[in-house]
Amino acid sequence: MSNKKNEDIEMRAVEGANDFGGEKDPFLGRNSPVLRPRGREPTASAYFGKLDNSPGASIIAYCLSSISMTVVNKYVVSGESWNLNFFYLGVQSLVCTIAILLSRQTGLIKNLAPFDSNKAKRWFPVSLLLVSMIYTGANALQYLSVPVYTIFKNLTIIVIAYGEVLWFGGSVTPLMLLSFGLMVLSSVVAAWADIQAAIDGVGHSAETSAALATLNAGYAWMGLNVVCTSSYLLGMRKVIKKMNFKDYDSMFYNNLLTIPVLVVCSLLVEDWSSENLAKNFPIETRNKLMVGMIYSGLAAIFISYCSAWCIRVTSSTTYSMVGALNKLPIAISGLIFFDAPITFGSITAIAVGFVSGLVFAWAKVRQKAQEAGLLPTTKPTMSASAQSNRDANS
């Protein structure tokens, strides 16, 4: 889905949190302690000052914004006849772009650079990768349950980690390998549980074939999404450093440049007949769908704000661990709101996926500590291309 910000969070987890955007947050400055005269009642500004520097509040806000984004995306694309994903993603990008511009006008975002056509041309290939990522993600979420979708998203971390080894001189530690094994295991268990639930639910009949075909389509889209997401995040990391973009610069260009692409794709590929529009937006749910589409665009801003807030008042390590822990409530939200099958296999897959995220987050913490010289370390193994690049630059 436009899990644009969710995907950015995945990348930040791989890198150790907020390494590829530059600034932590353009409009979240560190507040000085609020002082009030003795004997007076606390003012509203004092209360909000405390809240703004509360680690617990920032963590809760980040988790709620991320969960709500996934739930709303799933709700919108779960219609029986839904087939307007390009249109939906275009609305998301439009809402997000308008929200960023309004935030700049009101002073909430203080350092968003003016639009530069030369930068836009250089950034456009990244935006095309973003379109492929969000479109394949939307289709995968349409066919798969939220828990399965969340579990399979972990596979993106593996691809990105090895992409970093090849192109950025990264390394993979034994603890990371353990987490990767757990991620693969959780995905296999989730797929097996999903298929068994489909067979048990409808029996061996034509309905079984239809249910399995739906799951197979979901897995195919999920596989494409893993490739597209990894390509987008690795490509963005490479380009963003050359262009010296801040967090909200990249978000602004991403959303602005994807709007024409998504609109053209929607007009060319999707059915805009009145009959199909009526199927996609039934009268009984039309208003809810429109609200959900608008909220999903705003949610990208909310997640970005809460991510930076969490990093500012806690640490990148805490943020990374919270991102891993947040996989569990996201998966559980799918069980609660969308009647996903609750079986021994599905619960096991969620548990293993949750543990794999924790192990990976801990592995990144240890790796950063080693790089900082806080732990004993050995020379990491890297690819020949990365080693040659390092030798050439030394």
Curated annotation (Swiss-Prot):
The keyword Endoplasmic reticulum applies. SUPFAM superfamilies: Multidrug resistance efflux transporter EmrE. Coiled coil: none annotated. It is found in: Golgi apparatus membrane; Cytoplasmic vesicle membrane; Endoplasmic reticulum membrane. It comes from the Eukaryota. Residues 1-56, 103-122, 169-174, 229-249, 310-317, 363-394 are cytoplasmic. GO terms for cellular component: cytoplasmic vesicle membrane; endoplasmic reticulum membrane; Golgi membrane. Residues 78-81, 146-150, 200-207, 271-288, 339-341 are lumenal. Keywords: Cytoplasmic vesicle, Endoplasmic reticulum, Golgi apparatus, Membrane, Sugar transport, Transmembrane, Transmembrane helix, Transport. InterPro entries: TPT_transporter. It is a multi-pass membrane protein. The chain crosses the membrane at residues 57-77, 82-102, 123-145, 151-168, 175-199, 208-228, 250-270, 289-309, 318-338, 342-362. The keyword Transport applies. Belongs to the TPT transporter family. SLC35D subfamily. Homooligomer. Involved in the import of GDP-mannose from the cytoplasm into the Golgi lumen. This is GDP-mannose transporter. It comes from Chaetomium globosum (strain ATCC 6205 / CBS 148.51 / DSM 1962 / NBRC 6347 / NRRL 1970). The gene is VRG4.
